[in-house]
């Protein structure tokens, strides 16, 4: 369950940012997660609640913004949506795609006191 590890890393980032900005409490965390990242959002939410107990992020809202997958076809050069790895180009049917979006995993913003 790598969601638990991800939440530990998120809390480390929160602590770093909060310490540098002299924050007392984190009220909301906004994550950007690419559609192609293998993250179970329910497990991530559960892990976040567990990991943040006793920290400045305890009871913080976790908001997840999903970034759709997108690729450029190496054959026809069209930008196409990508729902999973090894999708084919919706324009020409080629499987040679270069991923441009969908693998993001970052803390986008925090609301703090």
UniProtKB/Swiss-Prot annotation:
Ni(2+) binds at residue 2. The keyword Metal-binding applies. Keywords: Metal-binding, Nickel, Zinc. GO terms for biological process: protein maturation; protein modification process. Pfam families: HypA. HAMAP family: HypA_HybF. Involved in the maturation of [NiFe] hydrogenases. Required for nickel insertion into the metal center of the hydrogenase. InterPro entries: Hydgase_Ni_incorp_HypA/HybF_CS (IPR020538), HypA/HybF (IPR000688). It comes from the Bacteria. The gene is hypA. This is Hydrogenase maturation factor HypA. It comes from Legionella pneumophila subsp. pneumophila (strain Philadelphia 1 / ATCC 33152 / DSM 7513). Zn(2+) binds at residues 73, 76, 89, 92. Belongs to the HypA/HybF family. GO terms for molecular function: nickel cation binding; zinc ion binding. The keyword Kinase does not apply.
């Amino acid at each position: 369950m790598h969601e638990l590890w991800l939440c530990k890393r998120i809390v480390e980032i929160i602590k770093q940012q909060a310490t540098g900005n002299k924050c007392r409490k984190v009220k909301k965390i906004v994550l950007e997660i690419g559609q192609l990242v293998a993250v179970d959002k329910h497990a991530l939410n559960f892990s976040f609640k567990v990991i943040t107990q006793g920290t400045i992020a305890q009871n913080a809202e976790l908001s997840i913004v999903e970034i759709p997958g997108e690729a450029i076809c190496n054959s026809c050069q069209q930008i196409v949506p990508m729902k999973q790895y090894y999708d084919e180009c919706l324009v020409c049917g080629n499987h040679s795609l270069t991923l441009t979006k969908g693998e993001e995993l970052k803390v986008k913003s925090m609301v703090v006191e």
